[in-house]
Regions:
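Positively charged, low-complexity intrinsically disordered leader regions
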Residues: 1-4
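Active-site loop ensemble at the mouth of alpha/beta enzyme cores that anchors a bound cofactor
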Residues: 187-197
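Short, solvent-exposed loop/turn elements at beta->coil junctions and helix N-caps
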Residues: 183-185
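Active-site-proximal beta-alpha core segment in soluble small-molecule metabolic enzymes
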Residues: 7-180, 192-193
Length: 197
């Protein structure tokens, strides 16, 4: 059902954190992988490793914080780490291990990421040695609501996010996989130009 609503070129990234919300992380991920899903998101390093041990291929994005001391495990298990803020990015880079990351951009939730308006820190994150930025993302935290105030706020988040992505491209940086929508956003705001939903 979700696939039928995706814009051309958009893939599903299945969020299977917390044992797929109680349904069994590995079982759910294997079923989705057989159905063609090639990207997954988890809450923490242990969940990512568990999926790899269960035979899950493709991208596995860790949405939560991973201690920089555990960077070798990110590399060993071919996991992609969210950069929680610029200090986290600096600390990961300082470990001297090549780590694939997605950069979280804070477009208003104020829980995770570099402020989308802070272009100096965003550029620094892209320039950090040992970090391979494979994507940028944010979270539309009221996209499940159709209240006028929430719709307006979601639109502000989208504008800020896509303006930042466009600025990165103009500055000569490839943002990689771009993702901001959840399934709620997909229903309420179809056809956004995303690589993942």
């Amino acid at each position: 059902v979700l696939r039928n609503t995706l814009a051309p070129g958009t893939e599903l990234m299945a969020v299977v954190k917390a044992e797929a919300y109680g349904h069994g992380g590995a079982v759910t991920a294997r079923t989705l992988q057989r159905a063609g899903v090639r990207a997954f998101a988890v809450a923490c390093l242990a969940e990512g490793i568990a999926l790899r041990k269960a035979g899950i291929r493709g991208t596995i994005l860790i949405l939560g914080y991973t201690s920089p001391e555990e960077a070798p495990l990110l590399t060993r298990w071919h996991l992609t780490q969210t950069v929680a803020d610029i200090d986290h990015g600096r600390a990961l880079a300082a470990r001297g291990r090549r780590v694939h990351v997605h950069l979280a951009l804070d477009t208003g939730m104020h829980r995770l990421g570099i402020l989308a308006e802070n272009r100096k820190e965003i550029l620094e994150a892209f320039r950090l040695p040992n970090l391979v930025v494979d994507g940028v993302f944010s979270h539309l935290y009221v996209s499940d609501s159709l209240e006028a105030e929430d719709v307006a706020y979601t639109q502000e988040q989208l504008t800020l996010f896509y303006d930042t992505v466009a600025w990165l491209r103009t500055a000569g940086y490839d943002p990689g996989k771009v993702h901001i929508q959840s399934s709620y956003g997909l229903w309420n705001l179809p056809a956004q130009p995303c690589d993942y939903v």
